[in-house]
């Protein structure tokens, strides 16, 4: 069971999870490739009460976090690079005004300079919006920016604690290949 704000959410359909305050960016991004950047962003507004009919304006914060999106509003999502698609997916999730943002491997397969942009954006999201972030990530330098860590093997938690206490032994035992 997954309970968020006292509400059982794991059996709810995605749109109800979004309306309950959870933003989700899946591994692999899952943007809509045949929609424009702007249309993909508008989908994020659907999570708000009243949906797109009531909320038509894209929050400027997403363009501050990911300036490339403003330049490519008319471009199809499928024409963006992988890193740009990831930025679009995170921005779309943010537009639903989540209380919790779930990011599943947001830097997987992304070129290093875009990884830095995404890391910087996530830091800003945490510090400026009050949104909680649950990050599934393999890049240890990014993980170390979190408050807590959980190491998993075969779907179970095998180690956890404050990230400041993430030891070399734990890294070698559970996080090394």
Task: Walk through the language-model features, giving the residues of each.
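ABC ATPase NBD Q-loop/coupling interface
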Residues: 1-20, 49, 163
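ABC ATPase C-loop
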Residues: 93-94
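Helical segment within the ABC ATPase nucleotide-binding domain
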Residues: 116-129
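Catalytic Walker B motif of ABC-type/P-loop ATPase nucleotide-binding domains
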Residues: 101-105
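ABC-type ATPase nucleotide-binding domains, specifically the catalytic core motifs of the NBD
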Residues: 12, 37-57, 65-67, 161
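H-loop (His-switch) and adjacent beta-strand-loop-beta switch element
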Residues: 149-161
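Conserved ABC ATPase signature
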Residues: 76-80, 84
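Conserved catalytic motifs of ABC-family nucleotide-binding domains
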Residues: 97
């Amino acid at each position: 069971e997954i309970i968020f704000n006292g509400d059982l959410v794991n059996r709810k359909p995605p749109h109800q999870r979004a309306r309950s305050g959870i933003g989700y960016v899946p591994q692999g991004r899952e943007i809509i490739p045949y929609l424009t950047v702007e249309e993909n962003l508008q989908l994020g507004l659907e999570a708000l009460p009243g949906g797109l009919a009531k909320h038509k304006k894209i929050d400027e914060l997403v363009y501050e976090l990911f300036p490339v999106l403003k330049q490519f509003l008319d471009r199809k999502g499928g024409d963006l690079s992988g890193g740009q698609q990831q930025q679009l997916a995170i921005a779309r999730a943010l537009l639903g005004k989540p209380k919790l943002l779930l990011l599943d491997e947001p830097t997987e397969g992304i070129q290093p300079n875009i990884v830095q942009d995404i890391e910087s954006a996530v830091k800003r999201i945490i510090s400026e919006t009050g949104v909680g972030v649950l990050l599934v990530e393999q890049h240890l330098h990014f993980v170390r920016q979190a408050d807590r860590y959980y190491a998993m093997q075969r779907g179970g938690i095998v180690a956890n604690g404050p990230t400041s206490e993430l030891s070399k032994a734990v890294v070698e035992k559970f996080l090394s290949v």
